[in-house]
Amino acid sequence: MVYTPAEYEKGKKKYPVLYLQHGWGEDETAWSRQGHANLIMDNLIAEGKIDPFIIVMTYGMTNEAKFGTIGAFSTNDFEKVLVDELVPYIDSHFRTIAKKDSRAMAGLSMGGMETKSITLKRPETFGWYGLMSGGTYAPSDIKSADQVNLVFMSCGSKENPAGVTKAAEELNAAGQKAVSYVSEGTAHEFLTWRRSLYQLA
């Protein structure tokens, strides 16, 4: 699924792109149906709080781990489809700013795990990283100063807020740019992730 700003059809402007991943057991509709990503974006844009951008939401249930088992979590198949096929397709069929610094990847829970794996393996593709209840980045993950423009990490206050906050502090102390957000009073749920998307945008 692809979200385009309301103004998209009215001109020839090119836009940055966010590749936004769902969690375990969900599909490409999750961020629209449960996450209300389109409404969050429309409101932020209408209020002049953010510059418009495109969101691509794709199916990510391609890893090898099985729910309830101790399987190896692999994003190899999804990585190939996303980076080698989907990104070029989106850049050729939509008016995107087709360069790393205008391309972000973020995800919730399992989608955050996919995001971390893929952004670190393909640093030439994405310039902005976002993990929502999906782990953290460490300074050792970032190999060069120009690898990423900003790292965003979030979770609910009933999850592991100290870990997210500490990770952002450590990244900033190492000279990288990172922000953390803790959704007050929420757990591993879409209220956390809706609020996180609002902050990320």
Describe the role of every protein-language-model region.
Residues 1-201:
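Non-catalytic cap/lid and distal C-terminal segments of serine-dependent acyl enzymes
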